[in-house]
Amino acid sequence: MPYIKNIKTSNIIAGLLCLLAVPVLMASQEWNDHDRSKKLLAPDLATDYLESCAPNAIVISFGDNDTYPLWFAQEVLGVRKDIRVINSSLLGTDWYINQLRYKINDSNPIDPIWSKEQIQGSSRDVIYEASRVFGGNAGMANQFLQQAGITDPSQPMDLYTMMKDFAGSDSPNKTQASQDGTAINIFPTRKVSIPVDVNLVRQNKTVNADDSVLSSIQFEIPKSILYKNDAAILNIIAANKWKRPIYFTSPYGELGF
């Protein structure tokens, strides 16, 4: 019996040694290969991004690889805490949009236009262009829009008005009922316009003093569906009203930028 117990004990010890040997071997052979303490591309690039921005800027980033170095530079290195870095992927969630309402570090709050209740849970996860809701039937779509107060749907619509008073409305004459009875939120047109505050853009040096400035910027949204993160970006731009410079870490073709 003592012999059998010794065999069992030996087997247990041997098994534990084998289990320990694997991570020890990996650490001894691979530790240096995975040491990133001297790889400074990410924090250096993030620092350059932040330092190149105007004061009190908004930076909209795309995905983790863009965002985490920027957050590291701000929170750990203390670089440009006046800038609000916004991860566009997280804008699809209500809790992240709600964080915009508060001051973070030295960055002032941002107006997301819609209230907490309007974006809660799955509310406004998807917003449809009017023509898509009516299956491409232009006549029905135009009739719906005219009843909602839009006399000429072919003309560009003020972006703030569209997002606040139409896409942000739960009024029965600005929504359509789905098959299960829930309201479908709608945006009237892809053609939008952003009025330019000429005096403000000269004052905050968005443009040079001798530059000519248009009275509005017009663009066309290249798709008939706005997901919550797309709509949130449009809301940020519309509500900003040229008070803060807005930067993107890469082109955003999904919204026609």
Go through each PLM region and give its residues.
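ER/secretory pathway lumenal C-terminal domains and tails of membrane proteins involved
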Residues: M1-N56, W71-F257
